[in-house]
Curated annotation (Swiss-Prot):
Lacks the C-terminal regulatory region which is replaced by HisZ. Catalyzes the condensation of ATP and 5-phosphoribose 1-diphosphate to form N'-(5'-phosphoribosyl)-ATP (PR-ATP). Has a crucial role in the pathway because the rate of histidine biosynthesis seems to be controlled primarily by regulation of HisG enzymatic activity. Heteromultimer composed of HisG and HisZ subunits. The gene is hisG. It comes from the Bacteria. PANTHER family: ATP PHOSPHORIBOSYLTRANSFERASE (PTHR21403:SF8), ATP PHOSPHORIBOSYLTRANSFERASE ATP-PRTASE (PTHR21403). InterPro entries: ATP_PRibTrfase_cat, ATP_PRibTrfase_CS, ATP_PRibTrfase_HisG, ATP_PRibTrfase_HisG_short. It comes from Bordetella pertussis (strain Tohama I / ATCC BAA-589 / NCTC 13251). This is ATP phosphoribosyltransferase.
Length: 223
């Protein structure tokens, strides 16, 4: 098949981003007949023969787009910041879709006086998956920290003495409260953005641009 005639590929992750992307696609007249939560397929067709979806880990979406395995993708700001810190290639981010909204926060045990520790100049151990965002946040505030990278179960770290604080995504705060933690500081608001491979935009722009425009219109109507 002529690469220029091949379907466009949109990289998505399972879960909240996939679920909140579906209304945007529907608004653009595109339906996805299979749900990745119930299907084992990693490549999903759509009602538009010119577009297919690939299902990857959230942290891998920017990599698939950067290297051209996907023409475009949808990823959270948190993921994009961490990706940019590790990769030299830049991704075109034409639209903040305002989906999968949450906050990146500093959280501690409810009995830990975070403000007092900061005021006293204590060096804090901070566990997080979002190393770059955490490092930039504490550097800007002049707080001395040692960053410990974890990949999951972040709430456990302060409870077992691994860390004084965590930096993690928070939606309702229910998981923090259930584990005796409290958010004490916002790092940044998070939402998901449309990202596009820059080479594809040049070589397949006539097909990509209408889809980008459709996402923009859909996000504005649904917002």
């Amino acid at each position: 098949m002529n690469p220029a005639a091949a379907p466009l590929t949109l990289a998505l992750s399972k879960g909240r981003i996939f679920e909140e992307t579906m209304p945007l696609l529907a608004e653009a007249g595109i339906e996805v007949p299979e749900n990745p939560e119930s299907s084992r397929k990693l490549i999903l067709p759509t009602s538009d023969p010119g577009l297919r979806l690939i299902i990857v880990r959230a942290s891998d979406v920017p990599t698939y787009v950067q290297y051209g395995a996907a023409d475009l993708g949808i990823a959270g700001k948190d993921v994009l910041i961490e990706h940019a810190a590790q990769q030299s290639g830049r991704l075109y981010q034409p639209i903040d879709l305002n989906i999968a909204k949450c906050r990146l926060c500093v959280a501690v045990r409810q009995d830990f006086d975070y403000q007092a520790a900061v005021h006293q100049g204590a060096r804090l151990r901070v566990a997080t998956k979002y190393v770059q965002s955490a490092r930039e946040h504490f550097a800007a505030k002049g707080v001395h920290v040692d960053i410990i990278k974890l990949y999951g179960s972040m709430e456990l770290a302060p409870l077992v003495g691994l860390a004084d604080a965590i930096v993690d995504l928070v939606s309702t705060g229910g998981t923090l409260r259930a584990n005796g933690l409290a958010a004490v500081e916002d790092v940044m608001p998070i939402s998901s953005r449309l990202i596009v491979n820059q080479a594809a935009l040049k070589t397949r722009g006539a097909r990509l641009q209408p889809l980008i425009d459709a996402f923009r219109r859909a996000s504005e109507r649904i917002a």
